[in-house]
Regions:
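Active-site loop of classical SDR/Rossmann-like NAD(P)-dependent oxidoreductases
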Residues: 309-323, 339
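Beta-loop-alpha module in the N-terminal Rossmann-like domain of NAD(P)-dependent dehydrogenases
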Residues: 39, 70-131
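C-terminal helix-rich "cap/oligomerization" subdomain common to oxidoreductases
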Residues: 20-21, 78, 88-90, 245, ...
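Predominantly a Rossmann-like dinucleotide-binding segment in NAD(P)-dependent oxidoreductases
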Residues: 145-231
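Rossmann-fold dehydrogenase core element
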Residues: 126-145, 165-171
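Contiguous beta-strand/loop segments that form the cofactor/metal-binding neighborhood of enzyme cores
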Residues: 200, 206-285, 322-332
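Hydrophobic residues in well-ordered beta-strands that form the structural core
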Residues: 74, 114-115, 139-141, 278
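N-terminal Rossmann-like dinucleotide-binding module
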Residues: 17-68, 326
Length: 358
């Protein structure tokens, strides 16, 4: 089917799918902290996206968002009732608010991008999934480390079977988060709003592990709070051992008690046909690759980590997240959601099962 549309003085025939591709996707960002501003910046840079609103409970003047000449709202309800045309709400608020705000946006007809984690409990994550299905809206979970060249490469290696059977996987996450991060009056470190170290700092790497090797079982864990007493309501370190449902065994060693700056986020894989270690501060470089009948290709450089002044985060790949949202909602036939709501829910499930052993 083709439609007649007028462009200037000309009337042309076009396909409805083409009209959808030409339409800019309208984004509203709720939560204008470090990561919310990153979302706003990436939306304005994408040629297929348009930033139409910002929202935060703090006064606009305190947020450093002068570059964005769009309407500003002090609550999600006020935003959703404003009459502004919105295709996507980007939820960049404290972790404990993600699920409820995502559901509220979906119920009013918006698609949603949820920063990690999508929820702090499996029950709340399931409610987001239910709302997405009930109202037929897409929910995109932000796990931007999937876009880093080493992640793309190792995913292809695992899925192609080149590594053979997976024997052992060791995930190490050693970062610094101290009083420069856990500030008085902030939500970081709060049990209800933050949720814990695995949710806030290391869910990206648990997502990569799940993406590559699937679910885990037979979990054993030990936890410690070495130097965050009075700063957080939870552990700063842990040792976790488990089996993979698909075969093989794994471990996770993590800590935010590292002095002064991040040390590493790495994954070591021992498999039937070889071994690989991906390392760096946020799994941004292949440090070791020795695989049967295989020569390691040169990979594109990974984007640098998000820079928050005294502390650093994961790779600056939010541009890929926004591009994926635009292409999916514009009807690109070859595009699928990079991290869908079911995968986001699975990461919450894994972390909840680990924390249940405290």
């Amino acid at each position: 089917m083709r439609l007649r549309v007028r462009r200037g003085d000309k009337e042309i025939l076009t396909h409805p799918h083409r009209m959808l591709m030409d339409k800019k996707i309208k984004f509203a960002v709720i939560g204008c902290g470090h990561i919310g501003k990153r979302h706003a910046e990436m939306v304005t840079r994408d040629p297929g996206a348009e930033l139409v609103a910002l929202c935060d409970i703090r006064p606009r003047e305190e947020l450093g968002i002068e570059a964005y000449d769009v309407p500003f709202f002090s609550s999600l309800m006020e935003l959703l009732q404003s009459g502004i045309s919105i295709d996507v709400v980007n939820v960049c608020t404290p972790n404990g608010l993600h699920a409820a705000m995502a559901i509220q946006a979906v119920e009013t007809g918006c698609n949603v991008v949820i920063e990690k984690p999508m929820a702090l409990t499996l029950a709340d994550a399931e409610k987001v999934v239910y709302a997405s299905l009930k109202y037929r809206k897409q929910v995109f979970c932000v796990m931007q480390n999937r876009y880093s060249p080493p992640s793309v490469w190792i995913k292809e290696m695992v899925d192609s079977g080149r590594l053979g059977k997976i024997y052992m996987v060791q995930l190490n996450c050693y970062w610094n988060r101290d009083e420069r991060y856990y500030k008085p009056g902030g939500w970081h470190g709060d049990a209800a709003l933050d949720g814990g170290t695995l949710f806030t700092q290391f869910s990206h790497f648990i997502d990569i592990m799940y993406w590559l090797f699937g679910d885990i079982c037979n979990i054993q864990a030990r936890f410690a709070d070495f130097n965050h007493a009075g700063l957080t309501a939870f552990e700063d370190s842990g040792l976790v051992n488990f089996n993979f449902v698909n075969g093989g065994m794994g471990s996770l060693s993590y800590s935010t008690s590292v002095w002064n700056r991040n040390m590493e986020s790495s994954m070591l894989i021992v498999a039937e046909n070889g071994s690989v270690k991906i390392g760096g501060q946020y799994m941004n470089e292949v440090e070791y690759c020795h695989i049967k009948d295989y020569e390691m290709p040169e990979l594109a450089p990974t984007n640098p980590g998000n820079d928050y002044g005294p502390y650093k985060g994961s790779a600056q790949n939010h541009n890929f997240v926004i591009r994926n949202v635009v292409r999916v909602l514009s009807g690109a036939s070859s595009e699928c959601i990079t991290t869908n709501v079911l995968e986001g829910m699975k990461v919450v499930d894994i972390i909840q099962r680990i924390y249940a052993l405290k």
